[in-house]
Amino acid sequence: MKFVDSATISIQAGDGGRGCVSFRREKFVPKGGPDGGDGGRGGHIYLRANKQLATLLDFRYRKQYLATRGAHGQGSRKTGKDGSDIVIEIPCGTLVKNAQTHELIADLTEDGQEMLVARGGKGGRGNQHFATPTRQAPRYAEPGLKGEAFELEMELKLMADVGLVGFPNAGKSTLISVLSAAKPKIADYPFTTLVPNLGIVRYEEYKSFVMADIPGIIEGAAEGKGLGLQFLRHIERTKILVVLVAADAADIALEYQTLVQELEKFDSGLLLKPRIAVITKMDIASEDMVVPELEGVKLLMISSVTGKGLKELKDELWRQVSTCSRSEDQPLDEHLG
């Protein structure tokens, strides 16, 4: 199953400035020749790969990018100032196509790699360029050329930063729906989630991470029971594991340990990943709920219904995600089954 983030934006490079119609006006020079300067170039638009970016989420909030036009030429042969260039930063590995022709424009894979995608219009020539022996006082200049404009279609194979692990009905789908814009199927019965759902969690502007709601695990998953190996293959690709146990579980500590044991049976290396334990559904927790003591693992208690603890969880997830190197990510591009 391929997980692809996509966005479409409009870009408009700046138009070139007009050339100037002007004549020298100096003392003792009653009939000065043409001295109109050229217009400035319109601003270019560049794409730049940035390894700190993980998703295309910010392009859902800003859809248009307009570079400024070049300034018009002036007298005394002064050329107008060039328009300001725009640099649009995108995650490494983003495929960029012309939305109309679907032609591949860019595939920037290295951090800092840049590409010019829309050229600003050339500035028009001033009237100084049009003087001839028979026409010594030309009264016209060129307009600036239009900047390039089109729509860009961007696609990015997502890297899962955070994997949600838990038995069916632990509240994984509900959590991902309140932290992100994902709309997974949610119902009060086991195995509602049959394929991984991905949600993009926006932490701050230009800061986001990807959360994978993995299908519910059951005891024996490492041997292939339930969704078994289909589930565990996707867990391998995440950087941080969040182990969820519902507050109404019969024995929270035992359920947590069972989940950890299933991970260890499949691949003991999974236990080397950063891990957070989360007790969900605190809105229905009983007064005599026993909070387990988990050595070496941060434990948070949340309610996706009331919002209790969600900010603390989001802060902790971002803290851990931002310390992990994105260079070790693997695209989520395998098929289930």
UniProtKB/Swiss-Prot annotation:
Its EC number is 3.6.5.-. GTP binds at residues 166-173, 191-195, 213-216, 280-283, 303-305. One of its GO terms (molecular function) is GTPase activity. Transmembrane segments: none annotated. The keyword Secreted does not apply. One of its GO terms (cellular component) is cytoplasm. Residues 160-322 form the OBG-type G domain. Mg(2+) binds at residues 173, 193. InterPro entries: G_OBG, GTP-bd, GTP-bd_Obg/CgtA, GTP1-OBG_CS, GTP1_OBG_dom, GTP1_OBG_dom_sf, OBG_GTPase, P-loop_NTPase. Its cofactor is Mg(2+). Its main location: cytoplasm. An essential GTPase which binds GTP, GDP and possibly (p)ppGpp with moderate affinity, with high nucleotide exchange rates and a fairly low GTP hydrolysis rate. Plays a role in control of the cell cycle, stress response, ribosome biogenesis and in those bacteria that undergo differentiation, in morphogenesis control. This is GTPase Obg. It comes from Chlorobium phaeobacteroides (strain DSM 266 / SMG 266 / 2430). The gene is obg.
